[in-house]
């Protein structure tokens, strides 16, 4: 079969998987999301020391009835974002050469990353960190964006063969994140919610940019701190050595 046709079919399968999961999540109950809520809750119990019990059509309630892990805590949007980032990156990097097995492999990796990000997000919420200059809703949104985009960026760096992280390369996970968290809700008419949506829009737009900028600054600082200047004698030896080698080569010719 023509490689371009295979590539197009792979792109179509990836897109349909993401859309199908997005639609499923939009109507799913906590009972239907136990495949991701249950392992997430188990990890939260391990790392937080709290215990939770499942309540049908509600979610996992803590034993002291102060915290609920409900459907919005499932992290399916992060799962979709991670899956799209991994698969689209593979399709772009190995254009017309990618094998079909990368799709289920990306799904498994994205699921594992989602469990880690979800567990971290919920444990942060359980820690009752107080950010005085934000109200409760703003802090919840702030923590969510920082944790989820931070883990998405980390996943990109780890799976992208740990190449040099340039600003142009980091635009890829940023663009995927914006597409899922901003473009899709906007096209679905979420902007009709008014001020609440635009506040959410501002957080999701600005915080990832600050994270990327902070990462690049830290990377530059690290490289500058580990740049060891060569002694003058070494530089001279290399210079004269290379010129000597060149002269010998010319004589040999």
Kindly label every feature range from the protein language model:
Residues 1-253:
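Hydrophobic N-terminal alpha-helices or hydrophobic patches in metabolic proteins across all domains
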């Amino acid at each position: 079969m023509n490689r371009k046709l295979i590539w197009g079919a792979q792109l179509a399968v990836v897109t349909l998987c993401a859309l199908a999961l997005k639609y499923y999540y939009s109507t799913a109950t906590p009972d239907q999301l136990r495949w991701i809520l249950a392992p997430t809750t188990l990890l939260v119990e391990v790392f937080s020391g709290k215990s939770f019990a499942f309540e049908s059509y509600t979610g996992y309630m803590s034993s002291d009835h102060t915290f609920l892990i409900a459907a919005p805590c499932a992290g399916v949007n992060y799962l979709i974002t991670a899956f799209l980032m991994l698969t689209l990156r593979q399709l772009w990097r190995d254009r017309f050469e990618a094998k079909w097995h990368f799709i289920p492999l990306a799904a498994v990796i994205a699921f594992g990353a989602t469990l880690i990000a979800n567990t971290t997000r919920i444990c942060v919420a359980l820690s009752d960190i107080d950010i005085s200059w934000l109200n409760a809703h703003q802090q919840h949104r702030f923590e969510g964006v920082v944790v989820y985009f931070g883990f998405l960026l980390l996943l990109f760096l780890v799976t992208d063969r740990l190449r040099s992280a340039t600003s142009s390369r980091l635009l890829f996970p940023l663009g995927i994140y914006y597409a899922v968290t901003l473009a899709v809700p906007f096209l679905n008419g979420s902007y009709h919610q008014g001020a609440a949506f635009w506040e959410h829009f501002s957080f999701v737009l600005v915080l990832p940019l600050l994270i990327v900028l902070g990462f690049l600054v830290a990377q530059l600082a690290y490289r500058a701190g580990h740049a060891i200047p060569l002694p003058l004698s070494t530089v001279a030896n290399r210079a004269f050595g290379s010129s000597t080698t060149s002269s010998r080569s010319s004589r040999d010719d």
